[in-house]
């Protein structure tokens, strides 16, 4: 599958404020696209196929988008192995991103290293450690548990923001535990 939306957040640091950016890609193939799934995310097949003016303005070729993403991500001045990817079920995202860079013959400029943090696995570990494994760990479940609002579930932009808030609450929990030691 080709990603249609890629949304990233750069966490705030001493040198830069927090920033989020979302890119829209025209898929390489339209074979496996389900129209019903597009509607959930607010996309239209005719836009993806560039049959509309709006679609031609919004959805760009992966080769163009990758350069924009690389430039935006590397503004932090870090090397790829110093940067980490945080996500919910992050291996899915990391594999899809790496495959996208591979299809564009650009793996050598992939802006992330191997460091990943997964909100789903963090939550599973917390529950497992307390002997209370939940039946599931969907982002929807975690936003509810932590009181996080996801204004438009299943859109990359909103899911990324919600995941970040869940991650910050998980991180705050660990900070409190570690401060007691």
What are these regions (language model features)?
Residues 44, 107-108, 129, 149:
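Short coil/loop linkers at secondary-structure junctions
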Residues 102-113:
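A short alpha->loop->secondary-structure connector
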Residues 1-90, 98, 144, 154:
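Conserved non-catalytic scaffold segment of RNase H-like nuclease domains
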């Amino acid at each position: 599958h080709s990603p249609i939306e890629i949304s990233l957040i750069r966490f705030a640091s001493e040198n830069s404020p927090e920033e989020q950016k979302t890119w829209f890609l025209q898929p390489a193939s339209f074979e496996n696209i389900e129209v019903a799934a597009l509607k959930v995310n607010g996309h239209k097949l005719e836009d993806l196929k560039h049959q509309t003016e709006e679609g031609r303005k919004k959805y760009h070729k992966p080769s163009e988008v990758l350069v924009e993403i690389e430039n935006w991500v590397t503004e932090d001045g870090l090397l790829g192995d110093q940067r980490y990817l945080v996500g919910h079920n992050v291996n899915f995202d990391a594999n899809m991103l790496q495959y996208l860079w591979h299809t564009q013959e650009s793996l050598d400029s992939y802006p992330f290293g191997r460091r990943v943090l997964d909100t789903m696995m963090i939550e599973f570990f917390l529950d497992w450690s307390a002997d209370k494994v939940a039946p599931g760990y969907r982002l929807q479940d975690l936003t509810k548990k932590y009181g996080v609002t996801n204004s438009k579930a299943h859109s990359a932009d909103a899911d990324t923001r919600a995941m970040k808030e869940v991650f910050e609450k998980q991180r705050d929990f660990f900070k409190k535990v570690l401060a007691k030691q």
